[in-house]
């Protein structure tokens, strides 16, 4: 699977959003109720939503975040053959509430990415860009 990174707002069409979420200085990942693997909070952009609105909605639905800020990190295109576009956001969570319980079974804090990821060909690429490029550019 290919995964390419672009500056924010480069792509003309977005299908997905991904949040790289920090809480108490650690990476917050979620586990879907039907899987044993860990993933970032994100998903499809719904009709009429901007990528930022979708990122905020997915963050709340999949982590229980109550107070947070999000900022665009990059665009990405991933897939085999036909690439599908998405936007990555940095989410700084100040307060977590109860999990909505719709899709995710639990969240957990990590110092780094675990080996058992739901999307092992995409998440490390996005996290690496976030960690090595995006954070380095922040004041």
Q: Model-found features: residue ranges?
A:
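Classical N-terminal secretory signal peptides
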Residues: 1, 138-139
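Short connector loops at helix/strand junctions that flank enzyme active sites
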Residues: 14-16, 22, 33-35, 40, ...
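Conserved Nudix-box catalytic region and its N-terminal flanking loop in Nudix hydrolases
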Residues: 22-61
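Unchanged
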Residues: 45-69, 75-129
């Amino acid at each position: 699977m290919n995964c390419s990174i672009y500056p924010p707002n480069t792509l003309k069409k977005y299908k997905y959003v991904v949040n790289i979420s920090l809480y108490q200085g650690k990476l917050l990942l979620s586990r879907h109720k039907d899987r044993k693997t860990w993933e970032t909070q994100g998903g499809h952009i719904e009709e009429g939503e901007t990528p930022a609105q979708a990122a905020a909605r997915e963050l709340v639905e999949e982590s229980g975040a109550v107070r947070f800020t999000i900022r665009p990190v990059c665009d990405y295109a991933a897939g085999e053959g036909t690439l599908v576009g998405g936007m990555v956001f940095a989410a700084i969570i100040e307060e977590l509430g109860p999990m909505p319980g719709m899709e995710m079974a639990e969240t957990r804090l990590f110092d780094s990415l675990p080996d058992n990821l739901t999307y092992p060909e995409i998440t490390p690429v996005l996290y690496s860009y976030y960690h090595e490029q995006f954070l380095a550019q922040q004041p």
